Amino acid sequence: MRHRKSGRHLSRTSSHRKAMFQNMAVSLFEHELIKTTLPKAKELRRVAEPLITLAKTDSLANRRLAFDRTRSKAIVGKLFNDLGKRYATREGGYLRILKCGFRAGDNAPMAYVELVDRATAGEAVSAE
């Protein structure tokens, strides 16, 4: 029985899942918008949102935890210097998942995952 077992297997081994979500989280924080399948997007929330919550309190221990989970110095810097400050007053819900149709080929449901308060291209141009 699978009672009280949370999370999706996504037809991968545990090490493959861990590596995949680590890479997806790094891509999300780097680009602030990624396109993936809907089940992966929903599971990515469970990895990425705690990292942003961790970044709201800047300490050496938290930076080391974030580096352990992302393995990227640049992303740790962005998390603590930019994203942690951006979401300091928000109590969670840092990601938005938007369904965007089905993939050609296997008809898999696709979704965009984006950071909630990200600067869009139009806002960046109008700010200048």
Curated annotation (Swiss-Prot):
Ribosomal protein recorded as keyword: yes
Single biological process term from Gene Ontology: translation
Claim: Signal is one of the keywords in the record: no
Cellular component GO terms, alphabetical: cytosolic large ribosomal subunit
Pfam families cross-referenced by the UniProt entry: Ribosomal_L17 (PF01196)
Coiled coil: none
InterPro entries: Ribosomal_bL17, Ribosomal_bL17_CS, Ribosomal_bL17_sf
Molecular-function annotations in GO: structural constituent of ribosome
Keywords, alphabetical: Ribonucleoprotein, Ribosomal protein
Subunit structure: Part of the 50S ribosomal subunit. Contacts protein L32.
HAMAP family noted in UniProt: Ribosomal_bL17
The protein's name in its UniProt record: Large ribosomal subunit protein bL17
Similarity annotation: Belongs to the bacterial ribosomal protein bL17 family.
